[in-house]
């Protein structure tokens, strides 16, 4: 089992951010966490990575039961994370190669000399992800898509059991977005691939390699289940409080409004 949350709630600064979350992810499942801005997605990710602890309820992630075992770095080394928050913490003068290498130590920057095996692994990942050509370039000079590939290589360095991709294609143009989504499909289809949790508020990013979706709305689970059972006209119209029509193309969902927007 990858994770299990039973009746989990989170209170921060006197406000309930998450309420009564029930969620179970089995090994080899790939999930989408889908919700609008402010739905509580970031807070939920912070709990999964043990930066926050639940106010109430029971929670297990990768065999670690919150409140009963020591977490922190021990858990986070099993999780590969790609997020905008992480990107802002990295040293801009580091090369893409150094960024990837740092994933072996779950560190920001390098503070020890990597072994030959570690260096070869980083090179192999950068090659596999189509990023080797800019391995020696400073991180700050890379395009957003190139930065994301370096971050994904970093996330995979420690052979994580869970790979969390938090809105990884934000800021990319159409071509760069589709190329990175192709890379994510490639990763998901590899032998011994980690379970993937893909976080987004754009339905068109949801790929056929994802099995299930958790719909989060105002800190609560709106729905959870198979992708095509969750992303229906009826469910999404209720989720968005507006009529929605779902178009499927090559097993990917695209949303349109079922009625035109009118002025109030």
Curated annotation (Swiss-Prot):
Q: Which gene encodes it?
A: ylmA
- What PANTHER family is this protein classified in? SKFA PEPTIDE EXPORT ATP-BINDING PROTEIN SKFE
SUPFAM superfamilies linked to this entry? P-loop containing nucleoside triphosphate hydrolases
Q: What is this protein called?
A: Uncharacterized ABC transporter ATP-binding protein YlmA
Q: Which organism is it from?
A: Bacillus subtilis (strain 168)
Record-listed ATP binding positions: 35-42
Pfam families assigned: ABC_tran (PF00005)
Superkingdom as given in the UniProt entry: Bacteria
Q: What is its EC number?
A: 7.-.-.-
